[in-house]
């Protein structure tokens, strides 16, 4: 079972890294789009809103779910630690604490991914509201 620890860590941290890179890429693309878009040229507010909010749900989903992914890594790490202790029959405090500390880093990583994603989502949603206000002002709304 000890051989599963690197696989669990790689999977959890790999998923979190992938999600964070995807979120940053989407945020950069959206910021570039918001700078270039002219809301006054849209005939429909619904079409503008659809274009402005495209892929923002990915960032909010990453923000809300990355702590759970980290928590899953922590739970699996704790399970592996206790399984190893049960299999060896040794109650060495050092190995218990080391195993638990390593398991908790997954939760920390999930939170580290979530916090910037929440901030990015808030900034991008604010830009959407600004562009929609531009549309409303241009179309007498």
Where is each model-derived feature located?
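Hydrophobic alpha-helical transmembrane segments of small proteolipidic membrane proteins, enriched
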Residues: 1-40, 46-132
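Cytoplasmic juxtamembrane regions at transmembrane-helix boundaries
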Residues: 129-141
